[in-house]
Amino acid sequence: MPTYTSLSAPARRPRTLSGALCIGALVAGSAVALLPWRSVAAQLPAAAAAAAREPATYTELWQAAAVAVDQGEFERNDAVRTALYAKATAYARRAVALNPGDAEGHFHLSRAVGRTALALGPRERVKLGIEVREQALAALKLSPRHPGALHVMGVWNAEIMRLNGIARTVAKAFLGGQIFSTASWSEAVRYLELAVQVEPERLVHRLDLARIYRDLERTEDARAAYRAAVASADFDPNDRVYRQQATEELRRLK
């Protein structure tokens, strides 16, 4: 499986519009890994090779999109990070154009678009938030148990529900975000629980599911999911960071 990013926020508080919809990350990235069914160690040489040349084939393009998102996640330079996400989006769009009948291109486009939204204003962010959903659903239509797309949809629903009431109303009424009315906590739970079921070894699924349980005040479920995340073996390059987040959030859970 490609590597994923934890897509939801560690902090527990209602979101303003400017703080929401930064969710293309699956998934939600891990620093450099990308290839299906590969361990972290096995992925590193392939990632380096992919980054060293301009991608041309479908597989090379979605892999390059994954690498660019992964590299951008913890990039501190705003301009460099924005450029990486723009590159990822361009690669993913080319991948989908070459092979619209495969789920990976759509998944990585949802991931890249969500990250690209980070640098944009509210109206553009809402527009891309809608595309995140569209591309994740396109991936699920082609591969109904695609864990990355399941993760994206789970976090998409959760992020909309985390918007404060005013922000959600503004997005729906004035910014073209009527589709946000479809979001629900029950769908957030359903998608993330299925992602964990399909891919139980992936820490980020359990971490983002724990955050949803936490926000729903399902404290014991949240505690169990956080503990499972902490106990997970490294699968993606940034799992050590996510494990630290899970450990701290578990400590603060009441």
Model-predicted segments: where are they?
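N-terminal secretory signal peptides that target proteins for export/translocation
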Residues: 1-14
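Bacterial N-terminal signal peptides
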Residues: 19-33
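N-terminal leader/linker segments that initiate helical-solenoid repeat arrays
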Residues: 32-78
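Short coil/linker segments at helix-helix boundaries
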Residues: 66-101, 108-145, 155-195, 234-241
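TPR/TPR-like (Sel1-like) alpha-helical repeat modules
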Residues: 133, 219-237
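Long, repeat-rich segments with strong aromatic
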Residues: 199-210, 214-217, 235
